[in-house]
């Protein structure tokens, strides 16, 4: 499954309040660890079709990053029913996989 970008604060709110289970990768183009873990995130999206996988470029969509309190990149946050469920800060594949397993079974 292709991971698509969230392009507005409104789109972000619609997505997290849609009732879907969502995992968002908050990243930046200049972030080396973000580029390293991106293929892992893509692969996990293929393996978990019941979870919506999206990305937010924090430089382009700073309002979203500010709203959820992003302090470092990459940060992965899971949402369900409009609420934050969990987050992983840093390019840690094992922790990311655990976050996705947890939201997939929520």
Question: Where do the language-model regions lie?
Answer:
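Conserved Rossmann-like nucleotide-binding pocket used by diverse enzymes
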Residues: 2, 27, 52-54
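Conserved helix-turn-beta segment immediately C-terminal to the redox Cys motif
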Residues: 19-21, 36-56
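Short pre-active-site segment immediately N-terminal to redox-active cysteine/selenocysteine motifs
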Residues: 20, 27-30, 72
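Conserved redox-active cysteine motifs that mediate thiol-disulfide chemistry
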Residues: 26-39
């Amino acid at each position: 499954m292709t991971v698509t970008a969230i392009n507005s604060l409104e789109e972000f709110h619609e997505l997290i309040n849609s009732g879907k289970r969502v995992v968002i990768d908050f990243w930046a183009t200049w972030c080396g660890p973000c580029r390293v873990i991106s293929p892992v995130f893509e692969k996990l999206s293929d393996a978990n079709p019941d979870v919506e996988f999206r990305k937010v470029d924090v430089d382009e969509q700073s309002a979203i990053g500010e709203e959820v309190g992003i302090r470092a990149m990459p940060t992965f946050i899971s949402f369900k029913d409009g609420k934050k469920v969990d987050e992983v800060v840093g390019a840690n594949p094992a922790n990311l996989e655990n976050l996705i397993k947890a939201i997939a079974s929520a």
